[in-house]
């Protein structure tokens, strides 16, 4: 499987993580956090924040040339306004991916945690720890970057399961079904 760009969306900061998934092997490529400049946060200039997200992800896609894009779905917000801003930030990220002809996959936070930690109720530290373990990292990435790497790992595992299921044969009472 090719390079996968995972994204943990946010309207103030957004984590990204890139992994190489070959068969069942996962390899770390890069990760980081796109931070919105303080003046844009103070001015509460959402349109400019969305531009920063779009431009930053476009540059990351251009630099690393991933073949697949996975992003976490919005699962909760402090208020309706926060949910709308987060949804718009996700939209900017998705448009950056689609603009570069990347297929987009979306995953619920619980599914990401389940895929990486083994339980959908995992906390951030458990996710960070398992990301380090699965990718053989000596140092834990920032929380948002670890979450983005977890999204990429979830996508890689989901794709591997689909490949396995497509090639699998079921046996019942000694005969192929």
UniProtKB/Swiss-Prot annotation:
Q: Could you give the cofactor binding note from the entry? A: Binds 2 Mg(2+) ion per subunit.
Q: What this chain does, per the record? A: The RuvA-RuvB-RuvC complex processes Holliday junction (HJ) DNA during genetic recombination and DNA repair. Endonuclease that resolves HJ intermediates. Cleaves cruciform DNA by making single-stranded nicks across the HJ at symmetrical positions within the homologous arms, yielding a 5'-phosphate and a 3'-hydroxyl group; requires a central core of homology in the junction. The consensus cleavage sequence is 5'-(A/T)TT(C/G)-3'. Cleavage occurs on the 3'-side of the TT dinucleotide at the point of strand exchange.
First-level EC class: hydrolase
The UniProt entry's GO biological process terms, in alphabetical order, are: DNA recombination; DNA repair
What keywords tag this UniProt record? Cytoplasm, DNA damage, DNA recombination, DNA repair, DNA-binding, Endonuclease, Hydrolase, Magnesium, Metal-binding, Nuclease
Question: What SUPFAM superfamilies has UniProt attached to this entry?
Answer: Ribonuclease H-like
* Chief location: cytoplasm
Q: Where, in this chain's numbering, is Mg(2+) 2 bound?
A: 72
From which source organism is this entry?
A: Teredinibacter turnerae (strain ATCC 39867 / T7901)
Residue stretches spanning the membrane? none
Where is the secretion signal located?
none
Q: Does the UniProt entry include the keyword Nuclease?
A: yes
Cofactors per UniProt?
Mg(2+)
Q: Which InterPro entries does the record associate with it? A: RNaseH-like_sf, RNaseH_sf, X-over_junc_endoDNase_Mg_BS, X-over_junc_endoDNase_RuvC
Which CDD domains does the record associate with it? RuvC
Recorded catalytic reaction(s): these are: Endonucleolytic cleavage at a junction such as a reciprocal single-stranded crossover between two homologous DNA duplexes (Holliday junction)
What residues make up the catalytic site? 8, 72, 144
Q: Name one GO molecular function term.
A: magnesium ion binding
Q: Which GO terms describe its cellular component?
A: cytoplasm; Holliday junction resolvase complex
Which Enzyme Commission numbers does its entry carry?
3.1.21.10
Localization per record: Cytoplasm
Describe its assembly.
Homodimer which binds Holliday junction (HJ) DNA. The HJ becomes 2-fold symmetrical on binding to RuvC with unstacked arms; it has a different conformation from HJ DNA in complex with RuvA. In the full resolvosome a probable DNA-RuvA(4)-RuvB(12)-RuvC(2) complex forms which resolves the HJ.
What does the sequence similarity comment in the record state about its family? Answer: Belongs to the RuvC family.
> What Pfam families has UniProt attached to this entry?
RuvC
Keyword Ribosomal protein applies? no
What is this protein identified as? Crossover junction endodeoxyribonuclease RuvC
Q: Where does Mg(2+) 1 bind?
A: 8, 144
